A protein has these predicted regions:
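Ser/Thr/Asn(+Pro)-rich, low-complexity disordered segments
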Residues: 209, 213, 252, 262-265, ...
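Beta-rich carbohydrate-recognition modules and glycan-binding surfaces
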Residues: 17-200
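Short acidic/polar inter-strand loop motif in beta-rich domains
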Residues: 175-178, 274-279
Length: 714
């Protein structure tokens, strides 16, 4: 029985890993309506292509896979040119193989002859392939039907097999008829010329549907069938007329459907889809009844979805948090794991996940950490979840990251206090956590015995060569607090005042700069290295912004960066005669809120107030982070709850996912992030729960070593 179980589990993991990386999909759907951000169009002369601020239009009524496609609307003039590049949305692209096919679907809706179709090229950064005529690869050509175009990569000249494909370029071909053409493009991907072709005869299995106010969580049970490529989700409001709403890759077992209305019954069914897009028999139909939620139920719903990011995105071998749901390599994040532990403790307390499940996961984590590579007990930020070895590009980068280690230890200390039963499993977990905690030699991250600043990294090959001092009103606070609290390798308590509260900013090599006033600068050297110059930056600012007096922090920095120190450490317990941290967090939240009010007219026609801006620099001034606004709930509950309801009820169709709110968005550029960040996903349930019950704050502050720290700091 056990052998069968492990064989099936290994098989499932192998096909999930394959699906995560393979096939490579260049375009499936646009996350935003109207235009596709990851495209770039241009024309000249008497040619033309329809675009919106340089981006291809998105069509939501014509698609091959739900819910949209890209529209190519063009005129090929006799003295002009047009082209449109569609880019990968990430930095990886697709590394071509000799047996790969470039496959995409086209739908020709106008009177367009086969010879009037565009040409294509593939881009690999600056390298551009030879031009290929699409007409040469069309079979059974017809209008108003989806056609599959399959082009062997070996037939495309000037491709570099060692460089990833970054874009496909549709462009004006040899035909210059001067007529207007309209066609739609969907599902651009690279597949091997041979794919699993087992017929999907068994009907799909829909496990459950769970209704919330405006979203429905749909969960399925995937069979061990290698020819399944996607799960296709259908929705109906009358249990008769079903429409497809989404497809999901097999690396997911859940889809969250953000529905148009609440207080409505929705009916769902699913089908498996193979590599040729043939569908299996439908699953049974399940019903979800949405209803308007009160505040408490809405907060529960938000917390549950964000916590699911950590419960689902767990690396199998180590139990640690894996860095991407769509990458099969076993890279895990040390900091993300620490934040994930906090979120999952909330999940257990709220009965979203079983206590035993998290206990077993934590036991796996501490076993893995006990064998993983460390430097003076501290961990690198990225580890291989299979081997426990660092993931870096060169010997200098194979180093311990003290801030990532601090966030991991913070999570483990909370777990040590949560799993407090006198049972063998829980006592063994506490002992293992204590061993890891005591093993971190924080002193090794201070350059010399007379120094006060923690340095963010240390490498056995390069010592502090690529390391920088940390400090200031930001996420580094928890590293200083834990370093002072350590029962085995504590740094001086004075590091709080003379390290954390005296942040240093790198200026450059000290040579040639010695005339700079020593009152404003500090020369920091390391044995065998040239001295470097740092400026002392102010910690206390005592300034007024938008009528709010702010003692510390910066309105130039990300709000979420300044929220991180207080995920587990209750700011009310950090005694400092010069600053009340809880009040300062409240004031900082109000400053960001009022700054957004000052510019709210930009978006008043489409939504309520959007805040906070990600940053004040030109690159991020129009980007917003939903998590940062919601995470102010312990300090400014009224405006935080307003923000949560706005992002969910008014903008949920754009921002809500299986894992809660998206990372960032920019309406000016019609962009939303398709990636997730553990800080952004974790800070929402953690700070909501801290405001509601104080759970994480209470668990962390009751730790004996943290209690001793608080006494020291008084």
């Amino acid at each position: 029985m056990n052998k069968i179980y492990f064989f099936l589990l290994a098989f499932l993991l192998s096909i999930q890993a394959e699906a995560s990386n393979y096939p490579e999909v260049l375009f499936e759907n646009s996350l935003m309506p109207k235009s596709y951000y990851y495209s770039q169009s241009s024309f000249q002369g008497n040619s033309w292509i329809n675009h919106m601020n340089g981006h291809l239009p998105v069509a939501d009524s014509v698609f091959f896979t739900p819910g949209n496609s890209l529209m190519l609307n063009y005129i090929s003039g006799n003295s002009g040119e047009w082209q449109s590049a569609i880019h990968y949305s990430d930095d990886y692209g697709h590394l071509p193989k000799n047996n790969d096919l470039l496959i995409f679907k086209i739908f020709v809706s106008s009177a367009t002859a086969k010879a009037e179709l565009p040409s294509i090229q593939l881009a690999q950064g600056e390298n551009i392939s030879e031009e290929i005529k699409v007409e040469a690869f069309v079979k059974n050509y017809q209008d108003n039907a989806w056609l599959s175009i399959e082009i062997p990569l070996k037939d495309i000249g000037n491709l570099d097999n060692q460089a990833p494909i970054s874009s496909i370029i549709f462009k004006q071909g040899a035909n210059r008829d001067g007529k207007e053409h309209r066609l739609f493009i969907d599902q651009i991907e690279f597949l091997p010329n041979k794919t699993p072709d087992m017929k999907l005869t068994g009907k799909a299995v829909l496990s459950s549907v769970e209704a919330h106010e405006r979203h429905v969580d749909i969960v399925w049970q995937l069979p061990l069938t290698p020819s399944i490529r996607y799960i296709k989700i259908y929705r109906s409001e009358d249990n008769r007329n079903f429409s497809p709403v989404a497809v999901r890759p097999i690396s997911f077992n859940k889809y969250t459907d953000f529905v148009p209305r609440t207080n409505v019954s929705y009916y769902y069914k699913i089908a498996w889809v193979d590599y040729r897009y043939r569908e299996s028999p439908f699953s049974d139909v399940k019903t979800a009844e949405t209803k308007l939620a009160n505040d408490d139920d809405l907060l529960n719903s938000i917390e549950k979805s964000h916590i699911a990011y950590f419960t689902n995105e767990t690396e199998f071998n180590s139990g640690m948090h894996k860095i991407s749901p769509l990458v099969s390599e076993a890279s895990v994040s040390v900091k993300g794991t620490g934040i994930g532990i906090l979120a999952q403790v909330i999940g257990v307390e709220r009965k979203f996940i079983p206590r035993q499940l998290l206990l077993d996961r934590l036991k796996k984590i501490v076993r893995f950490l006990g064998k993983a590579t460390t430097y003076h007990g501290a961990f690198p930020e990225l580890l291989d979840g299979r081997s426990g070895k660092p993931i870096m590009t060169d010997s200098c980068e194979i180093a311990a990251n003290i801030e990532s280690t601090a966030y991991l230890m913070q999570g483990l200390l909370v777990a040590r206090n949560y799993f407090d039963k006198e049972e063998s499993d829980e006592s063994e977990l506490r002992e293992a956590i204590t061993s890891l905690w005591k093993n971190v030699d924080w002193k090794k991250f201070v350059k010399d015995e007379s120094g006060y600043h923690l340095y963010n990294a240390w490498s056995p090959a390069c010592s502090y060569t690529r390391s920088s001092p940390i400090g200031g009103y930001n996420s580094s606070l928890i590293a200083y607090l834990l370093a002072i609290a350590s029962p085995s390798h504590a740094i001086s308590q004075e590091s709080y005042n003379f390290g954390f509260k005296q942040p240093l900013k790198y200026i450059g090599p000290a040579i040639g700069r010695l005339s700079t006033s020593l009152n404003d600068t500090l020369i920091v050297g390391d044995s065998g290295q040239k001295p470097e110059l740092y400026s002392r930056e102010p910690f206390m600012i005592d300034s007024t912004y938008y009528g709010v007096r702010l003692m510390a922090g910066s309105v130039q920095n990300s709000l979420i960066e300044q929220q991180q120190p207080f995920l587990a450490f209750n700011p009310k317990n950090l005694v400092d005669s010069s600053i009340n941290y809880f009040d300062n967090q409240r004031d900082l939240s109000n400053v960001y809120y009022r700054a957004a009010l000052d510019r709210s007219e930009q978006f008043v026609s489409i939504t309520n107030l959007l805040w906070p801006y990600v940053g004040r620099d030109s690159a991020s001034v129009n980007r917003f982070n939903p998590s940062a606004a919601i995470a102010t709930y312990p300090y400014t509950p009224t405006i935080a709850l307003e923000a949560l309801k706005n992002y969910y009820r008014n903008l949920g169709n754009l921002l809500w996912t299986e894992y809660g709110f998206r990372d960032e968005f920019n309406f000016k550029d019609n962009w939303v992030s398709g990636k997730f960040d553990p800080v952004h996903q974790g800070i929402v349930p953690i700070m909501l729960e801290n405001a509601r019950t104080g759970l994480i704050w209470n668990l962390f502050m009751k730790d004996p070593d943290i209690k001793s720290l608080v006494d020291k700091m008084k």
